[in-house]
From Swiss-Prot:
Residues 1-23 form the signal peptide. It is found in: Secreted. One of its GO terms (biological process) is negative regulation of apoptotic process. The modification Pyrrolidone carboxylic acid is found at Q24. The modification Glycine amide is found at G33. Belongs to the GnRH family. This is Progonadoliberin-1. GO terms for molecular function: gonadotropin hormone-releasing hormone activity; gonadotropin-releasing hormone receptor binding. Stimulates the secretion of gonadotropins; it stimulates the secretion of both luteinizing and follicle-stimulating hormones. The record marks W26, S27, Y28, G29, L30, R31, G33, G34 as: Cleavage. Keywords: Amidation, Cleavage on pair of basic residues, Hormone, Pyrrolidone carboxylic acid, Secreted, Signal. Central nervous system.
Length: 92
């Protein structure tokens, strides 16, 4: 009976270790693949601060895609008007 809990604990521990070892390395500044160089550590933090300043500025986005008018939208509008007319006639 004692071997099963030990075996389960070993499997869980092995899984956690393998997951941690196979994960991707992220360097300073959250950019993948870079080397950690202590000489340039201050530069990377300053760059992160500049990126935050740029993110703080509001950005205006415009939709450049023009979708053709959908026939289903026209049908929906016609059905809504028909329902409103019928409801108006029933009230009278």
């Amino acid at each position: 009976m004692e071997t099963i809990p030990k075996l389960m604990a070993a499997v869980v521990l092995l899984t956690v270790c393998l997951e941690g070892c196979s994960s991707q390395h992220w360097s300073y500044g959250l950019r993948p693949g870079g080397k950690r160089n202590t000489e340039h550590l201050v530069d990377s933090f300053q760059e992160m601060g500049k990126e935050e300043d740029q993110m703080a500025e509001p950005q205006n986005f415009e939709c450049t895609v023009h979708w053709p008018r959908s026939p289903l939208r026209d049908l929906r509008g016609a059905l809504e008007r028909l329902i409103e007319e019928e409801a108006g006639q029933k009230k009278m």
